[in-house]
Amino acid sequence: MALEKTRGRRISVGETAVVVGAGRSGLAAARLLCREGAQVRLLDSNADAFSGREALAGELRQLGISIELGPHKPDQFENAAFVVPSPGMPVARLAGLVDEERAEILAEMELAWRYLENEPVLAVTGTSGKTTTASLAAAMLHEQGYAVFLGGNIGTPLSEYVLSGHKADVLVLEISSFQLQTCSTFCPRAGILLNITPNHLDYHKDMAEYTEAKFRLFRCQDEGDLAVLGESLRSLAARYGLKARQVYVSDAGRFSGSSLMGAHNRVNEEAAWQACRLFGVSEENAARALARFAPLPHRLERVRELEGVLFVNDSKCTTVSSLKVALEAFDRPVRLVCGGKFKGGDLAGLADLVKNRVSAVALFGAGREHFERAWQGLVPMTWHASLEPAVKHLAASACRGDVVLMAPATSSFDLYANYEERGKDFKRIVGKLS
């Protein structure tokens, strides 16, 4: 039986707390700290952060929250006891601004964790598969009859749950490396680490720091807790001296009837199931939940089949490693749409996979030179200024049995606000094909 978890200190009435970033998690953290009697300063480097949200700004000021917009200055952090950075803000940017001997820098999730009433937590991290696995775990727990909160890095911040006053039986939380880096006492009853491949190296100084952040998920666990890890992490985990009971999962495939494509989803399913077993979820209920589970948008999402050609939206594919996973999910010829703001990675390492599985590549937007340099001579490639002509080009010459797959292997920020917008555009384009 796991012992009651030790939590970090809570803010004291009258102490100063600085929240950096006026996004959803920052607003939730500011409200929680305000509720606890702190003097709250809400900072955002974007001078237009509340443009069109004037009523919200007025509401926050009514609560006593001070809002300061524009470049951050050291005096904004004076006398701070807590500093809660935006999940997307590298902690290194606070150097020279925060007196770390006086102020504690902590993630919004760490802050909210300190105000929970001992609800058990199932937390999921990894370079890829986090959202699907967290959603699967929530579905399995729900099938068993639990009242479940699903949130964290997916949807609702944990601070919003704390403020709501609701009480769930189990909290299922997706958590990123950004959040984990400033978690000090956060401790899930069951923690899942699916995989680690190069990502977010514009945020973390190197791969070692990124890996260290991911393994912080387990640092406060004890022998009564559970650590579920992808089989590929077995040797790496040995370096970290995990105290929790460990289970390693592979793509062997326990369940039948899943609508999720790809061997990587067998890993996601097994990881969710192993974590849910700790809460008494039966294999039968897990299987029922999985049979009803619909693929999440933009993750190897079947859009439509037109005259025997399958169109698949994998806009969430933003890295080279996730492109590899996407290509391995199909045993039929793939006509690949990719391109965008390249984040780095070894595209040349996919040469054999591209040569054997991809019949044509349509590049769009930025980053074309990376793909052309890595795959020149392996497969016919064309470049298009935007997504629509790229999709239409591949669709026009596709044969029955082909897959037209959008798996960009890049971020979307050259042409779109986010990967969701890019995926929606792909679905719009495909929906108009005839």
UniProtKB/Swiss-Prot annotation:
GO molecular function, one term: ATP binding
Main location: cytoplasm
GO cellular component assignments: cytoplasm
Pfam families: Mur_ligase_C (PF02875), Mur_ligase_M (PF08245), MurD-like_N (PF21799), NAD_binding_8 (PF13450)
Alphabetical UniProt keywords: ATP-binding, Cell cycle, Cell division, Cell shape, Cell wall biogenesis/degradation, Cytoplasm, Ligase, Nucleotide-binding, Peptidoglycan synthesis
Gene3D superfamilies: Mur ligase, C-terminal domain, Mur-like, catalytic domain, NAD(P)-binding Rossmann-like Domain
Pathway: Cell wall biogenesis; peptidoglycan biosynthesis
InterPro entries documented for this protein: Mur-like_cat_sf, Mur_ligase_C, Mur_ligase_C_dom_sf, Mur_ligase_cen, MurD
Binding site for ATP: 126-132
Localisation: Cytoplasm
Catalytic activity: UDP-N-acetyl-alpha-D-muramoyl-L-alanine + D-glutamate + ATP = UDP-N-acetyl-alpha-D-muramoyl-L-alanyl-D-glutamate + ADP + phosphate + H(+)
Enzyme Commission number(s) of this protein: 6.3.2.9
Family to which the UniProt record says this protein belongs: Belongs to the MurCDEF family.
UniProt function note: Cell wall formation. Catalyzes the addition of glutamate to the nucleotide precursor UDP-N-acetylmuramoyl-L-alanine (UMA).
Name this protein carries in UniProt: UDP-N-acetylmuramoylalanine--D-glutamate ligase
Organism: Desulfovibrio desulfuricans (strain ATCC 27774 / DSM 6949 / MB)
